[in-house]
Amino acid sequence: MEIPVIDLKALDGDKRTEAMAQLHEACENWGFFWVKHHGIDESLMEKVKDFVNCHYEKHMEKSFFELDLAKELGPKANPSEVDWESTYFLQHHPKCNIEDFPEIGAEFRKFNQCDSETVEIYIHQLTKVAEKLAEGLSENLGLAKDHIKKTFSPPFIGTKIAKYPHCPDPERVFGLRAHTDAGGIILLLQDDTVPGLEFYKDGMWVPVTPNKDHKIFVNLGDQVEIMSNGIYKSILHRVRAEKEGCRLSIATFYNPGANAVIKPDAKLLYPGGYQFQEYLAYYQGTKFGDKAARFQAIKEMFSK
């Protein structure tokens, strides 16, 4: 099963009609796809990955295996409700939280190939990709080009940085349990050698194979499915734990602002409307549950 590849440059070229059709098909039938010719500087992508890897090795690797999580893989333990990951979350917009991680700020300044400005440039370029995709999705739904962008405004942009260390017993725990993402458009810079990410399609788990060609992996979150009234899909995905290697994941979220009111356009129909922060509050307790049941509950809560 071959994951779709969207040529972002073609959305503005002579093959725009074909590229837009491919984007629509990927969103409607897959909910995830690769993006090539995205315009992000490849050396910048490598610098960001190098920085994250160096920071993990220096500040997080040793402490991870001292956590209760690692100890829970003992013979009598039941680790079914934990995730084998070492992670933190950086906020970029509307407010930056880098000061909450003093060691990261220090590393930015010391690391001779990457600094805070480098990361800011990467996020700026990545946001442009997200906005371009949002325009394509909006147009394909028959809406104004800036519909998703306006609905999200001001958007919340943040990055989940995760490392999935080698696991002594990968049959008993997942790197990250199966779930859909709460937000909008998720753009992933992932490991180029260590596998693990899988998406659920047509009754089977589809592996997202590591690649070295600097494509960005994209998946849609719950808000896009809801705004499209189910035309586009947020898809169940998970990360397998691996016995060998330490997988890198840098996932940037282009989400609605907390007070953004989410509902389909009148053309697409959907009962009620709600603030994204209200959805997040409900999502926290149901993240690893059934998405259809969650959507039905949301409909009932906000259509009264």
Question: Locations of the language-model features?
Answer:
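Peripheral, non-catalytic segments flanking oxidoreductase cores
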Residues: 1-304
